[in-house]
Amino acid sequence: MSTNSPSQKGKLKAVVISSAQELNVDVDLRRLHEACSSLGDYIAPFMKRVRLELQRVKDGEQADVPMVPLFIHSPIPYGEIKILFLDVLSGYPFLRVIQLHRCSIGDDGILTIAEFIRSYKPSPDRNPFGIQCFEVPECLIGHAGAKHIAKLLSENETITRCVLDFNPLGDAGAQAIANAVRWNGTLEDLSLQYCGIGSSGAEALAEGVLRCSNVRVFSLRGNPIGPEGIKPIGMALSIGGRINAIDVAGTSFGGSYQAVETFCQGVESSVSLTAVDMDYNLLVPEAASLIASVISRNKRLVQFCVNERMEAQQFLMIQNALEQNGKGSKKRKKKKRSKA
């Protein structure tokens, strides 16, 4: 019988069980990979990511839950959209990001995906976040599909980023989205680039997004909203207090001094805005001095992109004003750190 005390014996190494091991992540990844094997070639890149993640879990390199986004960048046959979302993915508990780029899913396809997101409720110990990022650029979604997305957003409490770029939503689709986001408390980043939105759609978005929602980053780049569309956006900026960055590049309003003035007045009055992009708008000559003075008066502005096709002296005037704001911003940060 050994007389050695426990302290004299070699200490046993503590066994550390990772989150991945505790939750049997490898089982879920293997099931997902097997289920995807019955689908078309479009799913191959995603399957490769899943297989690599599974190997990392087996090798002990992945100790946490998997973060594999559903990223597909080619057309999905309509017949397989329901299989993918309602059969294959419904049982996978770790999905947080859906990125479908140029997938040609159309209005009927987006209805199926909206139903999936609405019903996707994984257990909190595995995925307390749910679907947080939803990107469907260039997917042939029209105003009917926009209404399906709008209904989802009006009910959803998990999505923080929504990208609908290069879809023909039109004014009707924009109005549906605008009415929905005012009831959504979690969406922070909304992108509607090149969606064929005109002045009436812009007016609805000014009210729903800029005045009544929690959206902090908003893009209307490439939409023909024109002078009449930018005016309500400018007025909404002066009232809303959430927006941090707005992109209205290439929206065809720069030729109207009155429109530029109204927009700039809103930018100047904003208590939250730090970044503005109005590039690809040919500006009237008087606009440069107006923009520079707005930047000088609103010290929060540290980014302000404009079309470089103007007099060099005018462009430098704007850049100098931004540089001064940038220096001031750094000083304010240093003061906060010293107080802390």
Listing of model-derived features with the role each one plays in the protein:
Residues 1-340:
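Leucine-rich tandem repeat or coiled-coil scaffolds
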